[in-house]
């Protein structure tokens, strides 16, 4: 089961990477990119929207503060959050 969720997460990431970062400047694309990093890390989503989009199969982290992102991913997440605020995206 963990293998299936890993494969699904990899496919989502690959699809996200296919969109140039500069082009991912709308709220929906930023939401998907941001939450893809959380899915990859094993986060268990709580919102219905995220559960429907990503699912919770294979998740094992319930507290997002416990996620240990690599520095480059942490920086990208900070950039995404800044862009979401600038665009006034819903959270």
For every predicted segment, state its role.
Residues 1-6:
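Positively charged n-region of N-terminal signal peptides that target proteins for export
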Residues 7-8, 13-21:
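C-terminal segment of classical bacterial N-terminal signal peptides
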Residues 9, 41, 81-83:
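Enrichment for repetitive, rod-forming helical segments
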Residues 11-14, 28, 70:
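A general, composition-driven signal for non-globular sequence regions
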Residues 29-55, 59:
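Amphipathic alpha-helical packing elements
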């Amino acid at each position: 089961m963990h293998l299936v969720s890993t494969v699904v997460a990899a496919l989502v990431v690959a699809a996200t990477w296919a969109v140039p970062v500069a082009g991912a400047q709308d709220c929906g694309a930023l939401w998907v990119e941001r939450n893809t990093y959380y899915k990859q890390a094993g986060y268990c989503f709580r919102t219905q929207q995220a559960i429907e989009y990503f699912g919770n199969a294979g998740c094992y982290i319930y507290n997002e503060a416990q996620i240990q992102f690599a520095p480059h991913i942490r920086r990208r997440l900070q950039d995404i959050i800044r862009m979401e605020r600038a665009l006034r995206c819903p959270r």
